Regions:
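Extracytoplasmic "Venus flytrap"/periplasmic binding protein-like
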Residues: 24, 29, 46, 50-122, ...
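Extracytoplasmic/periplasmic substrate-recognition and gating elements
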Residues: 25, 49, 54, 79, ...
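Conserved C-terminal helix/tail region of periplasmic/extracytoplasmic solute-binding proteins
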Residues: 25-27, 78, 155, 361-399
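A structural signal for short loop-to-beta-strand junctions that line the ligand-binding cleft
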Residues: 75-76, 83-84, 113-152, 181-182, ...
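Hinge/lid segment of periplasmic solute-binding proteins
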Residues: 91-145, 169, 195-197, 282-286, ...
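Mature extracytoplasmic/periplasmic domains
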Residues: 102-111, 269-273, 301-378, 398
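Extracytoplasmic/periplasmic solute-binding protein
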Residues: 130-139, 145, 169-218, 261
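Glycine-centered hinge/linker elements that transmit conformational signals in sensory
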Residues: 172-175, 214-245
Length: 399
């Protein structure tokens, strides 16, 4: 059966990139990533299964934490022992590696398969292109703009599910009085910054956000709406439990899944945790993009392929890149991950109600919101995140 699946799968791949597999035979690939939660492991296994169904071996190197995984990749490259592929975010995180000539160009497979014709939205091409060549594979679109809601908690308390951050602030005291934690948070810097971004986009809208993150417009910072955003963000502290510091994001999601907490503000990767727990969208949990104007932020993940002294590795890397953008694999992976596929010709019939919301929005160019990582260096992003974290945790930090 496995041999048959391998043959059928190979037929779905472009002809120009099935020949390398046949000529090279069995291919072994080590992949570094940071997908370690239950939902994330279910998703990465879709890539691994597709690779192994082609008759190859997938060596899984999962490292907890994006910073740790990226650091390991860079150290391995510098040390002369690079992995076959490694995960990064849709961002400028890997630009230095491209400029230093450390990454394999994927232009050969990108041109042969017409990536520029099907990758959507086109902004993703901009992320991966350098001097007219592809150096990464975008595998999904993740949006940070979500509130995840335990429906049963809201029904028991007798308050409506909020549509905006302010509406949540209005009902949170009653949730607290009923003995539930209103807002589940993992008190890590990146989670705090993500929550601030959701509060800001809900309060300010994307045009104002672009003035802040892209243009560094001083007037946008001095605007009264930005001050309101800061006050609202800090006000959420009243509804977060004392166990938040250091909590992992998926542990915070579990609090909502289990009915200990009412809401989590987190990216759509949280959907994978609900799915693994057997929960159904709009039945057991709800998903809300807070704000009167709905945006879907353009985040997500890419894989890069470090250069290797062994010339055979390039063939393996091009095969893997091709596999990752295959429409069937894209459907399986993103349905498990909670993310949106990076092409529109994917079968989304299995999409749940929350995924469908994202699919509807991503087709509207005016609803797509670029993230800070797209415009700023990792150094700027880290400094910004640290300031936001200090502001949330230090009551003496004035607006």
């Amino acid at each position: 059966m496995k041999k048959l699946i391998s043959i059928l799968f190979s037929l779905m791949l472009p002809l120009s990139f099935t020949s390398a597999s046949k000529a090279g035979g069995h291919m072994e690939a080590e992949v570094i990533h940071w997908w370690t939660s239950g939902g994330e492991q279910a998703a990465i296994s879709k890539f691994a299964e597709a690779w192994e169904d082609m008759g190859n071996t997938w060596i899984d190197t999962a490292i907890t934490g994006g910073d740790n995984a990226r650091g390991t990749t860079v150290n391995r490259i510098i040390g002369g022992n690079p992995p076959t592929a490694a995960q990064f975010n849709i961002s400028k995180q890997f630009v230095d590696l491209v400029e230093q000539g450390q990454l394999q160009s994927l232009e050969e497979v990108a041109s042969a398969e017409g990536w520029r014709d099907f990758i959507y939205p086109p902004d993703l091409i901009e992320t991966c292109e350098y001097n007219g060549e592809f150096y990464c594979v975008p595998v999904n679109i993740h949006s940070s703009q979500w509130m995840w809601v335990n429906i049963d908690v809201f029904e028991k308390v007798g308050v409506p599910i909020p549509n905006t951050i302010q509406e949540f602030v209005d009902v949170a005291p009653k949730i607290q009085e009923a003995g539930y934690i209103p807002l589940a948070l993992g008190g890590q810097t990146w989670q705090e910054s993500l929550m601030f971004g959701v509060v800001a986009s809900s309060t300010l809208g994307f045009p104002h956000m672009a003035k802040l993150y892209r243009d560094k417009d001083v007037d946008a910072f001095r605007d009264g709406k930005f001050e309101l955003t800061l006050h609202t963000y800090r006000d959420l502290n009243r509804f977060i439990d004392e166990g938040a510091p250091g909590r992992l994001w998926n542990d915070a999601t579990a609090m909502v899944v289990e009915g200990k907490a009412a809401v989590q503000i987190m990216g759509d990767w949280a959907r994978g945790e609900f799915a693994v727990a057997g929960k159904e969208a709009k039945v057991d949990y709800d998903c809300v993009i807070p704000g009167n104007v709905k945006y879907v932020s353009l985040g997500g993940d890419v894989f890069v392929f470090p250069k290797n002294s062994d010339p055979k590795v390039k063939d393996i890397q091009l095969q893997m890149a091709s596999m990752m953008v295959n429409p069937t694999v894209q459907a399986d992976f993103n349905n498990a991950k909670g993310s949106l596929p990076m092409r529109l010709d994917v079968d989304t019939s299995a999409a749940d109600a929350c995924m469908q919301m994202g699919l509807d929005l991503i087709k509207q160019p005016e609803a797509i919101m670029r993230e800070s990582d797209d415009w700023n260096s990792p150094a700027f992003t880290n400094a910004w995140d640290d300031i936001i974290s200090e502001f949330r945790n230090d009551p003496n930090y004035s607006v």
